[in-house]
UniProtKB/Swiss-Prot annotation:
Belongs to the SecB family. One of its GO terms (molecular function) is unfolded protein binding. SUPFAM superfamilies: SecB-like (SSF54611). GO terms for cellular component: cytoplasm. Homotetramer, a dimer of dimers. One homotetramer interacts with 1 SecA dimer. It comes from Shewanella baltica (strain OS185). Keywords: Chaperone, Cytoplasm, Protein transport, Translocation, Transport. It comes from the Bacteria. This is Protein-export protein SecB. The lineage of its organism: Bacteria, Pseudomonadati, Pseudomonadota, Gammaproteobacteria, Alteromonadales. One of the proteins required for the normal export of preproteins out of the cell cytoplasm. It is a molecular chaperone that binds to a subset of precursor proteins, maintaining them in a translocation-competent state. It also specifically binds to its receptor SecA.
Length: 161
């Protein structure tokens, strides 16, 4: 019976404690002139994530989105959203925890951030903006691969010296 209780304590657990908007900004630096032009924007999306340990097994993950729309060479709008969440995560190995904080949690936060961006763009009276889904698992795998390559690069340079 003690073995069963011990195994239950070790079982991975993931709980969302809170999802909230940490920071938001919307700018239309060239209004009202931007509304007089034909609407043919170039939209750029920048993503960033970061995490911090708040307490034992409790983490804050912040997903930052910056959406910039250029129209005819002028900035039509700049929208920045930091969507955050507090997560309780237990029973994971270090690689599993890193994946949870770097991919799984941002996957949870993205729909909230996307909705906030869409709402702000609409309030700015611009045409509807629907951000495409993001594959955070692929982005995290790319990040891990880049870190591994950066870690092996100095060792290779020393061997060649």
């Amino acid at each position: 019976m003690a073995e069963v209780a011990n195994n239950e304590q070790q079982a991975p657990q993931f709980n969302i404690q809170r999802v909230y908007t940490k920071d938001v900004s919307f700018e239309t630096p060239n209004s009202p002139a931007v509304f007089q032009k034909e609407w043919n924007p170039e939209v750029k999306l920048d993503l960033d994530t970061r995490s911090a340990k708040l307490a034992d097994d409790v983490y804050e993950v912040v997903l930052s989105l910056t959406v910039t729309a250029q129209n005819g060479g002028d900035t039509a709008f700049l929208c920045e959203v930091q969507q955050a969440g507090i997560f309780s995560i237990t029973g994971l190995t270090e690689p599993q925890l890193a994946h949870s904080l770097g991919a799984y949690c941002p996957n949870i936060l993205f729909p909230y951030a996307r909705e906030t961006v869409g709402s702000l763009v609409g309030r700015g009276t611009f045409p509807q903006l629907n951000l495409a889904p993001v594959n955070f698992d692929a982005l995290f795998a790319q990040y891990v691969q880049q870190r591994q390559a950066a870690a092996t690069a100095p060792a290779a340079e020393e061997a060649n010296a």
